[in-house]
């Protein structure tokens, strides 16, 4: 960076607050960064060096003088402490993670270390260097796992069914422990599945919308999927990051479930998208590949966000059908602009699609 922090940030009138976002190049990180910049924050986005190819979601932010991007790794304690000490954030949003549930079975140690131990390292750094900073942890509905007693709220029993979910449970309990043991302002948002046009293409919703757009443009013939019967509580990521921010504006820290209160199957999402695309019954385009199933499936997730609605006044705005249509429309427009996929084999093979099971 050229010049001092003061010259870097003074170009825009701000609210005097600085926020650090880990995982800023991801879906949630990009939406959250935009929200905070709109609210006058100085935003320091942290990303892994290996995320270099994944900055498309935040490219427009580079023109904002209140946005700064730094390299970072949850496994690098020295880097973590240096950045927190340098920027002295008022708020820390920990969104970084290997977030693909199916992949966590293959990369279990990597997933667990980044999520569980990474959160521990970040909490320790915040407690020592910026004890008054507010800390947000991205917890996950996957922590509820196979628990049959849905809908799930903040008091529901956690029964994780994947390495990803187990790591999230560890981090979730750490946040509670640091809040009660040290008085640290630390809280977790238990986010149910949330999607957007910025969702990674290895996740089932985005796989479906992109495939439908390619099929519509005759760039693809088949789509390989796993369990179509899995049901999820799907919301819009842009709605969910608003609650992340709201959680850190309260006098006292607390944990909140973030959900729509509706559940839909993968098949329902598939049918909604293909109907909107004018492709008719999707069955003729779909092939089920058992390799896309998880070793342990979570069949049903449904959240109860009553606490967030009543205490914080939050509610989701984008409906399930609106979300599906939004994602398809964006993918279709992208392909039409860029002619993307022309060089791709017209039948996307199971090997290419290997990690495309539902989150």
Model-predicted regions and their roles:
Residues 1-194, 238, 248, 300, ...:
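N-terminal Rossmann-like NAD(P)+-binding domain of SDR-like oxidoreductases, especially those catalyzing
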Residues 32, 38-39, 45-46, 72, ...:
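C-terminal substrate-binding subdomain of Rossmann-fold SDR/epimerase-dehydratase oxidoreductases
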């Amino acid at each position: 960076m050229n010049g001092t922090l003061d010259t870097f940030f003074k170009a825009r009138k701000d609210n005097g607050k600085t926020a650090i976002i880990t995982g800023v190049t991801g879906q949630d990180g990009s939406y959250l960064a935009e929200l905070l910049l709109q609210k006058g924050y100085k935003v320091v986005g942290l990303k892994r060096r290996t995320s270099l190819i994944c900055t498309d979601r935040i490219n427009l932010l580079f023109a904002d003088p209140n946005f700064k991007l730094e390299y970072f790794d949850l496994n690098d304690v020295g880097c973590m402490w240096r950045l927190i000490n340098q920027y002295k954030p008022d708020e820390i949003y920990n969104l970084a993670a290997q977030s693909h549930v199916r992949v966590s079975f293959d990369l279990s140690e990597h997933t667990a270390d980044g999520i569980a131990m990474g959160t521990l390292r970040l909490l320790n750094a915040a407690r020592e260097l910026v004890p008054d900073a507010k800390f947000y942890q991205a917890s996950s509905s996957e922590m509820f796992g196979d628990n049959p007693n849905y809908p799930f709220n903040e008091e529901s029993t956690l029964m994780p069914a994947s390495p990803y979910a187990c790591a999230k449970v560890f981090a979730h309990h750490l946040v509670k422990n640091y809040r009660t043991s040290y008085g640290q302002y630390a809280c977790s948002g238990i986010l149910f599945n949330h999607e957007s046009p910025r969702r990674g293409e290895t996740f089932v919703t985005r796989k479906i919308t992109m495939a439908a757009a390619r099929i519509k443009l005759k760039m693809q013939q088949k789509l390989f999927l796993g369990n179509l019967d899995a049901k999820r509580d799907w919301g819009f990521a842009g709605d969910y990051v608003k609650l992340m921010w709201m959680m850190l504006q309260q006098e006292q820290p607390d944990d909140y479930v973030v959900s729509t209160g509706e559940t839909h199957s993968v098949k329902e999402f598939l049918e909604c998208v293909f109907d909107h695309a004018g492709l008719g019954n999707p069955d003729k385009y779909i092939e089920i590949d058992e390799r896309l199933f998880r070793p342990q499936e979570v069949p049903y997730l449904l959240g109860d966000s009553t606490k967030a609605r009543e205490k914080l006044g939050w509610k989701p705005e984008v409906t399930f059908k609106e979300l599906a249509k939004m994602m398809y429309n964006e993918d279709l427009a992208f392909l039409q602009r860029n002619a993307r996929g022309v060089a791709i084999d017209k039948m996307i093979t199971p090997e290419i699609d290997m990690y495309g099971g539902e989150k």
